[in-house]
A protein has these predicted regions:
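CN hydrolase (nitrilase-like) catalytic-core segments centered on the catalytic cysteine
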Residues: 1-8, 77, 83-172
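Active-site catalytic loop in hydrolytic enzyme cores
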Residues: 14-98, 111-113, 120, 183-190
Length: 192
């Protein structure tokens, strides 16, 4: 009806046993078809200084393949990733070396890590790969103690934050221009 592309994720997908799932992200085309899907590789197993312990691997299995890059007709080449992956720059270099001009990073960053790391990591991934970063982000309080950072963002290939949804529910919307990616990659040929 609306003829839009939609990113779903991360969401749980059965992993074939009774106790684990995969954390999946999928890009859907205008007609609802799945254009690409990715199961998160890097799991969030950390003990944070705020006293919260996270062991994602207790319920989630790591994906076995690097994320895809899909050429979306009428838009650009899009690479997928999920949340904690953002801390592993080699994954994003893989995406850019496979042509990604826009990188999706849906996330549920904790408020504790997000306040110091979220925006900086997103800007670093945009700059070092001269690609747009679109980062949908969960916000709010969950399960009593867990608080998500929020701040869904769109960042351009120069590292400029084009849109930030803040901590409230909402949307981060900004135009993405393939020609800007091309121009910055010519001016700053760090991918060669």
């Amino acid at each position: 009806r609306y003829q839009v592309f939609l990113l779903g994720g991360g969401y749980p997908v059965p992993a074939g046993d009774d106790s684990h799932t995969f954390n999946r992200s999928a890009l859907f085309g205008k007609d609802g078809q799945i254009l690409a899907k990715y199961d998160k590789i890097h799991l969030f197993d950390v003990d944070l200084p705020d006293g919260n312990l996270y062991k994602e691997s207790s319920t989630i299995l790591s994906g076995a393949e690097y994320p895809p890059v899909v050429d979306v007709p009428g838009l650009c080449k899009i690479g997928l990733s999920i949340c904690y992956d953002v801390r592993f720059p080699e994954l994003y270099r893989y995406l850019s070396s496979n042509g990604a001009e826009l990188i999706m990073i849906p996330a549920a960053f904790t408020a504790f890590t997000g306040k110091d790391h979220w925006q900086i990591l997103l800007q670093a991934r945009a700059i070092e790969n001269t690609a747009y970063v679109v980062a949908p982000a969960q916000t709010g309080i969950h399960y009593g103690r867990r608080q998500s950072h929020g701040h869904a963002m769109v960042i351009d290939p120069w590292g400029t934050v084009l849109s930030d949804a803040g901590k409230t529910q909402g949307a981060a919307i900004a135009p993405a221009d393939k020609e800007r990616v091309k121009k910055i990659r010519e001016q700053m040929p760090s991918l060669k």
